[in-house]
Amino acid sequence: MDYRKNLNYFKSSDKWYYIGLPIAVIGCGFFVCTLFYWYFIPYQMPIGIILAAVGAGIAFLPYSKCAKEAEIDEAVCAASENYSQEVSSKLSFEKELLKNTEPLTAHGYIYSDDVLMRRGRVDRVCRTSGYSVAKIFCTKYGLVVFDKSFSLTREAEHENMDSYPFAQLDFVSVVDEQFVCKDQSKIKVSYFVIQKDGTDILRLPVKHDVAVDKLCSTVNEMIGKMKNT
């Protein structure tokens, strides 16, 4: 992972793109008009070439020092898959896993005031410099959660493993929230939440889909059974 290029991406701005692009378009316009012998100003051809080159440089040169959005997406996807495989390869409690319940990989960008944030120019996805990935296993007695958070702009990561006995939990759920950015725009975010004694003891970024809803249903059913025994 190229931390410097990632840092440049999160600190970059689209303003140079929107300044340079019109200049390049005007330059190309002069160049094309000259080809059809339409002249509006003296030295139209060389001026058009210069404007096109300068505009393109202003618009696109800053991006050459930044990571592309696709590269960041590939990096977090690879990190998620690698961590998931790493955790699965060193399991020591396979016999205790609940049958017919697949482990869940929960992952997503970390949205907080402590991270750098940038909205994609094309896809408008709001990416941040922090990412979280977790592997959640459902055993006969409780949840076992391996989680890792890491930075995309510097060498920093944190790993943790905890077990959560069903009998001690209130419930688990997926919570959909809105995070308000510094520019006052809002982002929909989802968290896998474990609650104990009326308090959220774990919140993990997750994609809200059928798999996580199914896991929550299974876990809450197990919590109910344990509390009634």
Name each region found by the language model.
Residues 1-74:
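N-terminal alpha-helical membrane-insertion module
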Residues 83, 87-89, 93-94, 168-175, ...:
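Cytosolic/matrix-facing juxtamembrane and C-terminal tails of multi-pass cellular membrane proteins
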Residues 193-214:
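Canonical phosphoinositide-binding patch of PH/PH-like domains
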Residues 209-229:
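Pleckstrin homology
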Residues 127-133, 139-185:
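Phosphoinositide-binding peripheral membrane targeting modules
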Residues 187-192:
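Short aromatic-glycine-enriched beta-strand elements
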Residues 2-11, 65-136:
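Anionic N-terminal interaction surfaces
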